[in-house]
């Protein structure tokens, strides 16, 4: 599904990179299957980590599954090379790429404006004014008619993106 969502990741200026404990020959063997099964070609790099150095460094080896089985880990790393999000799924549970796009959008938004995103937020929905910003400053920044004060610590405003 990642390959199918290439344009969505590109819209967010986000690059995808995969890691597998399989070797390059193994990747070359199953990469064509992605096109056949998923209807798109593999369009992002996959790191071969057969010695498991990277997988072990990032705790991607499931302790109960043997040393050849990685858990489904996702890391969102920002342009400053700071890990902003880590998600680890059990081997039996697939990842939710719509959620990953939502998180990338939320991180980019909250990096660019003094806001926070509420639970289940999606782009275009109202956001929470940062608790560190006064209501007066929020009204000046976002517009007096755009800030709704529910409580002194809970103020809503339109998505500024």
Task: Enumerate the language-model features and the residues they cover.
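Chalcogenol-based redox active-site neighborhoods
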Residues: 1-161
């Amino acid at each position: 599904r990642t390959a199918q969502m290439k344009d969505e990741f590109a819209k967010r200026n986000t690059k995808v990179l995969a890691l597998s404990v399989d070797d390059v020959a193994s990747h070359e063997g199953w990469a064509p299957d992605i096109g056949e099964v998923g209807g798109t070609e593999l369009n992002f790099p996959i790191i071969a980590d057969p010695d498991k150095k990277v997988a072990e460094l990032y705790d991607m080896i499931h302790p109960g599954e043997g040393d050849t089985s990685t858990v489904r880990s996702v890391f969102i790393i920002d342009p400053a090379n700071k890990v902003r999000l880590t998600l680890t799924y059990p081997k039996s549970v697939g990842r939710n790429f719509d959620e990953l796009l939502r998180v990338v959008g939320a991180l980019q938004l909250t990096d660019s404006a003094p806001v926070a995103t509420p639970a289940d937020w999606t782009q275009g929905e109202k956001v929470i004014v940062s608790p560190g910003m006064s209501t007066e400053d929020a009204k000046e920044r976002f517009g007096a008619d755009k800030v709704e004060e529910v409580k002194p610590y809970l103020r809503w405003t339109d998505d500024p993106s």
